[in-house]
């Protein structure tokens, strides 16, 4: 971070990436004005356990005063914004690289995080990230404020809202 040895800050803001497991300690200590959550993914089961456990640990640590910026394409991440004013959602439109069928080895979101009914997916970006809905309780992908409207991984760029082109250092989503 940008601070002197005595702890005096040199900047008014910081961008910090945190491991999911550490958020229970970090969030209450930092009181972030804005919290961005990109995904909850079964990448570190040995450290963090099931994504629902990770969700619960993060949920109880989020301040009511923080503005949330959430990935609408992740059903569990979107749940952080349920019944919360001022949440900003981002995601991706249906892309040419998407699949209509599940192709991953495991699926973290077979069941709705609200009512536990089987989730319906209209498209998968990867694993459980995509466009989803629950026919039992009505939980579904939120409308987005910002969307990836085009992704060309061979050329190495994405477009946001068909207006802003971003060249990718890594040709991957």
What are these regions (language model features)?
Residues 9-122:
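Flexible active-site lid/hinge loop adjacent to a nucleotide/diphosphate
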Residues 1-3, 63:
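Walker A (P-loop) phosphate-binding motif
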